[in-house]
């Protein structure tokens, strides 16, 4: 390694240290906390929940009376008799539906279920956001680890290029070998630069999901390791059926369909309403400049009204029949979702088990590739293998290292998917 390389490494280390000092540390918990607070989709979903909570009110359901006030001033002028009349009228009235076939109670229950469904949809959004943040956070770590692998290969290629240049200066290497080594080094350097761009892009994606400015940089403190915990299928299936939020939402949707059936049935009952209030009127009249009318009235009133639809051309019957069909459809949708989720859970469990084994294979394979790379470097310098053999071994190491990193990421993704489908993320979000 020449002096220029040493100085370059020292300068790079100093720059990295300076940059790291200006970066905020970011572990996975902090990333999740920022996303749950700032994610745009969650902000919108929380606003929807606020609207549902406001609507969940007895006043919205129609339990309470309405009170209104009216005032008017009417003026008339008769041209033939040159008479003028004016009437001022004011009134305050109360209207109250005392009974409407239990519609008020059913409507209130429906509003509560709508709020519950909106809350459930927010929970699904939270689960999706948590899973996405986990995947993107570890995708950043994956890209950074791949960058380290590419840097290792690039440094080896640069060493080989410098080695060929030195041999050429001593008359021990031809131009062809130097150009071939230079081409390999520049290819590896281009791959390294492209990977640096991938790291920056992935960090920007993470910043967007957390609601942070794109240019913000972080010091990622989590280690790129996968949890190798084994799962029991029966336990996962039980948790999924009891805690999966999408399935819970489907049950709430069934309750809403039942509410709609009850509302349609309420049309078969009579309605009783109460009206009460007081009207005030004052009239004036003038003809030929003389007043001929000056009259004031104050009239309280109270009314009770009963109405009942005897025949409505089958509208009520059809409404109830359609509502009951929608109930049956909702039940079928529950069965369909439970079946689909069960299939998905079995697939995810199989993926997890296979990926555990693949990680073990990748770890063993990487150990062999690293040893082979170390041995081949000495063999290349001693002339036992040529540059093409050495390059093949470098590419094998690169491929194996990538496979091992991808195996770690795949196992992390499997665990995240299993946690989501069994409702495990909601416990974290509620803490």
In which residue ranges do the predicted regions lie?
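Acidic, low-complexity, intrinsically disordered peripheral segments
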Residues: 403-431
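Bacterial Sec-pathway N-terminal export signals of envelope proteins
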Residues: 21-68, 174, 214-258, 309, ...
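A short glycine-centered flexible hinge/capping loop motif at secondary-structure junctions
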Residues: 168-172, 380-384, 421
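Periplasmic alpha-helical coiled-coil/stalk elements that build and connect Gram-negative outer-membrane
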Residues: 128-241, 348-351, 355, 397
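N-terminal signal peptide c-region/cleavage motif recognized by signal peptidases
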Residues: 15-19
